[in-house]
Amino acid sequence: MSATIKPFTDEFEEYGRDESRASGEASSISFPTTEDEVRAILEKLGGHILNTSRMNRYLGLRRDEQGQFLLRVEPGVVLSELRKQLSKKVLPTAGWDQASLEAYEEFQEAPEQFFPTDPTETSACLGGMAACNASGARSYAYGPMRPHITGLHVALADGDLLELQRGEAFAQGRHLSLVTAAGRTLELDLPGYTMPKTKNASGYFVADEMDAIDLFIGACGTLGVITELEIALQAAPAVVWGVSCFFDSEDKAVSFTDSVRPVLSHAAAIEYFDAGALDILRRQREQSTAFASLPALDKEAKVCVYVELDCDDEAQATEELYHLGWVLEFAGGRDDATWVARTEVDRECQRFFRHAVPESVNMLIDERRRTDPTITKLGSDMSVPNARLADVVALYRRTLAESGLESAAWGHIGNNHLHVNILPRDAQDYRRGGELFAQWAAEVTAMGGAVSAEHGVGKIKAGFLETMYGHEAMVESARLKLQLDPDGQLGRGNLFSEKLLDELVQKGGA
């Protein structure tokens, strides 16, 4: 194992930061390639970055009783590679047993399969997607990562292992008993808070009689390290059309969203881009050759709502498009400026348009960090119930105008879930932006919403979780962590403060 452990030198600097542009520290780093290596590293080390990107094998395939294909993979499998292999119906089968090879033959003869979870970052690894319960644009129709995971292996802090299969272990009320690979029984007391009835990735997933596997999905790496996943595939839609609708005001776009949701039966995604986001794209198209292929935006286009339709055939898609057009006209949208993508080439152009926004913002923040390294991007991840969409958009607009901060917003308006990104120019902007986010967290909570809908709370927004659930819920969550990680060494600072965790460790933890 010693060859796997490396000192954390400047060579590995990129592994000490994430897309928030925040940085951390570590004494060492490793790139394990097997589950056994992960378990050995966990048993011995702290102050360590454990990178599972080289655990990227496909382990097997089976069909369940309903005929659905279930694919076992390691956590380092990259989403974009999985998509390519599924579309080509060619999976790497080295080391598969006979049952998996037989299922693979059926897979090749079956209609094309796909994995519906669709985060913007297609270079994401499946293990990381499970750790934060990723979702993305298609979550409007397909939900987040959680329901598409049927099995997990989770390496614990002491090197032991949990092998979890959906439908096999359930909580009794808020108490969960789990048996490890070594034969130990873990008795876990789950926090007592009630999760909001909105899109939510805030803190641990807990509910009465819950499936044990759901606790570890979205736990941000604080309870264990995912070393294996089993994911459920679905038959790919026969027809996919993308429709970009443009409006001259935000109010019209919100009205369109509220009106179109009950009308469309086959919408997979309803996405949003505000005036700030569109202006960034206009500048990038003019200034950078990398973005020259972006379609030109009409000067009158102030905001955009993108709708993706997943249909059984073109007749169904045409009917959905007719209903969408009727709502667009009623809401005051610009029918003459609408983009409709019916081919893969056109859809790829729209996909580039959608993904270019967050990429452009990250580039802008990187440029500003050269002047002030203390700043990072500030991106909200909050959601509210359907009835409060107009209210939360009005909250964002009013408070941003009062603050004078530069911003750009985009995201999953179909789920009432916008990413409002504040673009600080200096430390003062950064501080004011953080204060504004804290205000939003309180007001969104009062609306019955969630402070994090898909990214997970992580470190930067850990304080918002206490705003949402209260201090006692944080204590209960930290105690749950310590029942699985007694020294508090996994994902320190994620979800709750290191100070709270260390105080509980000193008092005997759980």
Go through each PLM region and give its residues.
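C-terminal substrate-recognition/cap domain of FAD-linked oxidoreductases
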Residues: 217-219, 225-434, 443, 447
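FAD-binding subdomain of flavoenzyme oxidoreductases
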Residues: 59, 80, 84-88, 95-262, ...
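N-terminal flexible segment immediately upstream of the FAD-binding catalytic core
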Residues: 1-71, 84-94, 230-233, 277-285, ...
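Activity-critical C-terminal alpha-helical subdomain
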Residues: 462-510
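Short acidic/histidine-rich active-site segments
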Residues: 412, 450-457, 492-495
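C-terminal structured "cap/appendage" subdomains that terminate the fold
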Residues: 438-476, 480
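A generic structural signal for well-ordered alpha-helical segments
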Residues: 40, 44-45, 86, 96, ...
